[in-house]
Amino acid sequence: MSQQRTLNNTIRATGVGLHSGNKIHITLRPAPVNHGIVFRRVDLDPVVEIPASGDLVTEVILCTGLTRNGAKVQTVEHLMSAFAGLGIDNAIVDLSSAELPIMDGSSAPFVFLLQSAGILEQNAAKRFIRIKRSVEVRQGDKVAKFSPYDGYKLGFTIEFDHPMIPHKQSYYEMEFSTAAYIKEISLARTFGFMHDLEDMRERNLGLGGSMDNAILLDDFRVLNEDGLRYGNEFVRHKILDAIGDLYLIGGPILGAYEAFKSGHALNNKLVRAVLADETSWEWISFPSPAAEQPPVVYTHPACI
């Protein structure tokens, strides 16, 4: 049986908002079966709950943001990616601000928090969204596509005219599992170019950005003294983002995702396109130990 998962304990952390530069408190709490992932703006009175749902996405420039009843929560993609990577179905995320902390620019700190809180398997079958037929969305030369696949596979191509991002390091593909996610994807940091950061600062964005939480490039090189964590860290981070953006579809996915130069906007467009076409997907569970086993491997909680 592939069971739903939540946290075993509540855990708290503090960090800086990438765009606001403000100190942010985050609390991750267990949630009951079929609750899903829900963000709560506890700095507001009354508190506003914002479900992690693709149809609530309103911000897709530089991050993924959700809005409900006028309340926003931004930069959700890295935490959502960690939830997906560890197979967390149900959780409550309390926030003291409209933005999640950027941590080190990857999802690894969130993975560590979830590991520290412990993972609890619940007495209910995990519900997968299985892609039944191909769905593709485009925006100019950018493409994002889901196809049927017995498992969860992600392939991504980036294209940047920069000597540190050569063509041979512009494509990456992974067969999704908890172990592969933690080892191959979770450490990949967000990245940006010095000229873009200067433009963002002029618009009061990226105020919390630094080489402590992002890879920064000038026209020729990586400026971070410690260099890259992976030779192709840039494209791996795009997969990290995609895993988080796509988890807003409402559950773990069985299908193949292929993207060319996609980003938060196109990822959300793909999620909405799938959900709008009920013939392209179905819910499926694996409730019995004797029944067919799910083709996606989630590491046992005791081993994470």
UniProtKB/Swiss-Prot annotation:
GO terms for biological process: lipid A biosynthetic process. Its cofactor is Zn(2+). Zn(2+) binds at H78, H237, D241. Pathway: Glycolipid biosynthesis; lipid IV(A) biosynthesis; lipid IV(A) from (3R)-3-hydroxytetradecanoyl-[acyl-carrier-protein] and UDP-N-acetyl-alpha-D-glucosamine: step 2/6. Keywords: Hydrolase, Lipid A biosynthesis, Lipid biosynthesis, Lipid metabolism, Metal-binding, Zinc. InterPro entries: Ribosomal_Su5_D2-typ_SF, UDP-acyl_GlcNac_deAcase, UDP-acyl_GlcNac_deAcase_C, UDP-acyl_N-AcGlcN_deAcase_N. It catalyses: a UDP-3-O-[(3R)-3-hydroxyacyl]-N-acetyl-alpha-D-glucosamine + H2O = a UDP-3-O-[(3R)-3-hydroxyacyl]-alpha-D-glucosamine + acetate. Signal peptide: none annotated. It holds the Pfam family LpxC. It is an enzyme of class 3 (hydrolase). The active site is at H264. GO terms for molecular function: metal ion binding; UDP-3-O-acyl-N-acetylglucosamine deacetylase activity. Its EC number is 3.5.1.108. It comes from the Bacteria. One of its GO terms (cellular component) is membrane. HAMAP family: LpxC (MF_00388). Catalyzes the hydrolysis of UDP-3-O-myristoyl-N-acetylglucosamine to form UDP-3-O-myristoylglucosamine and acetate, the committed step in lipid A biosynthesis. PANTHER family: UDP-3-O-ACYL-N-ACETYLGLUCOSAMINE DEACETYLASE 1, MITOCHONDRIAL-RELATED. Belongs to the LpxC family. This is UDP-3-O-acyl-N-acetylglucosamine deacetylase.
